[in-house]
A protein has these predicted regions:
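Loop/turn elements at helix/coil->beta-strand transitions in domains of secreted/extracellular proteins
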Residues: 57, 70, 82-85, 125-130, ...
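Active-site/substrate-binding loop(s) of hydrolase catalytic cores
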Residues: 97-100, 105-242, 306
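Short beta-strand-to-loop junctions in surface cap/lid or active-site-entrance loops
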Residues: 74-82
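Short glycine- and acidic-rich boundary segments immediately preceding or forming the N-terminal edge
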Residues: 23-69
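Bacterial N-terminal signal peptides that target proteins for export
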Residues: 1-10
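Bacterial N-terminal signal peptides
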Residues: 10-18
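Active-site-proximal beta-strand/loop segments in catalytic clefts of secreted hydrolases
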Residues: 61-64, 77-78, 89-92, 132-137, ...
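Metallocarboxypeptidase
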Residues: 72, 178-348
Length: 348
């Protein structure tokens, strides 16, 4: 009877899971690692943040999602009599979850340091900061729950078959804004970039339009992630800026962000993209052209040395990404204050 040496088998059983986890830790992890905010815990997370300084923060419901009537939450942070406002939207696309964590960490920093820290104190004296962790609670629910890794759109039944087809149904919320919408050729409803049946057809976008009409936004920043890696760690400006003063201001603020954020895995910093950008109904085009608001998009999450786009990293990298992007946002806010102060002085 042949004997079997069990030691190599035991060794393999112990080591292989470790090797697998180490490989995962350097790439994408799905289901998401434990420190990602999950949809079912978002409301409680927001309540905890407001509790830090309830006199300067309020949780708002600005609207509801198109298919499932889920609330779209916002945090309104700062003094109520502040004359200007800043908008940060952490997520338009369900799979792009890094911005949710970043936006909540930003809110926590603002409230934890106010009024002790000079930077936060001065900012919140003059600006209200509106933070919307996710504009797409439907897509966020699908991805954060582990149902599907790549879910870009909301859950509208776009093929009208009376059921949710996770991979194809939905509208790309960042192509549904009513500026340049008619120029977008993406009309196939099963496309991941489907722009919707008409401009602002989605209730999520209607909520943002209403908010924009009510507030005097001096800056709008939209956090995204590039699943393909083509746009990783780039900052995109509005289309058709035409070198105007407003465009130059937008570009200068974006440059501050880029200079403040090092790439995740490769050498160098984030880059402001200098080529032509999409003439579609996206958020930055809408705010820039409709309201004259400096607005730009930041693609969070880098490519590793193998060229793989990492938008669902492990906890350790997640924390690093969140920390440096919160610092970049704060640097942009400080630069905005400086520029606005100079503009006001020049008007006197």
């Amino acid at each position: 009877m042949q004997t079997i040496d069990v030691l190599p088998i035991i060794f393999g059983m112990l080591i292989l899971p470790c090797l697998f986890s180490c490989v995962q830790a350097k790439g994408n992890m799905y289901p998401l690692d434990t420190k990602y905010i999950k949809a079912e815990k978002l409301n409680a997370e927001l309540d905890q943040i407001v509790h830090i300084s309830p006199e300067f923060a309020e949780k708002r419901i600005i609207g509801f999602s198109s298919a499932e009537n889920l609330p779209v939450y916002a945090l309104q942070i700062g003094k109520k009599d502040a004359s200007k406002a800043i908008l940060v939207i952490g997520q338009h696309h369900g799979e792009e979850v890094l911005g949710v964590n970043i936006s909540l960490a930003l809110a926590e920093r603002l409230l934890s340091n106010y009024p002790k820290a000079e930077k936060e104190s001065h900012l919140l004296e003059h600006y209200q900061v509106w933070i919307i962790p996710t504009l797409n609670p439907e897509g966020f629910r699908i991805v954060s729950s582990g149902m599907l890794r790549n879910k870009r759109k909301n859950n509208r039944d776009t093929n009208n078959n009376q059921q949710l087809d996770l991979r194809t149904d939905g509208v790309d919320l960042n192509r549904n804004y009513p500026v340049f919408w008619e120029l977008d050729t993406e009309t196939e409803n099963n496309s991941p970039y489907y722009k919707g049946s008409e401009p602002s057809s989605e209730s999520e976008i209607k909520a943002i339009i209403t908010l924009a009409q009510q507030q005097n936004f001096a800056l709008a920043i939209f956090l995204h992630s590039s699943i393909s890696g083509v746009s990783s760690e780039k900052i995109f400006l509005p289309a058709k800026g035409n070198g105007s003063e407003l465009f130059q201001k937008t570009s200068s603020l974006a440059a501050v962000y880029a200079a403040s954020a090092k790439k995740d895995y490769l050498k160098g910093n984030y880059e402001v993209y200098n080529g032509s950008t999409s003439e579609v109904g996206n958020a930055r085009n809408y705010f820039f052209h409709r309201y004259g608001t400096p607005a730009f998009l930041v693609e969070i999450g880098g490519k590793n040395k193998r060229g793989q786009s990492i938008i669902h990293p492990s906890n350790a990298m997640l924390e690093k990404i969140v920390d440096k992007n919160v610092k970049a946002l704060m640097n942009v806010f400080a630069e905005l204050e400086t520029q606005d102060t100079k503009e006001n002085e020049n008007k006197l």
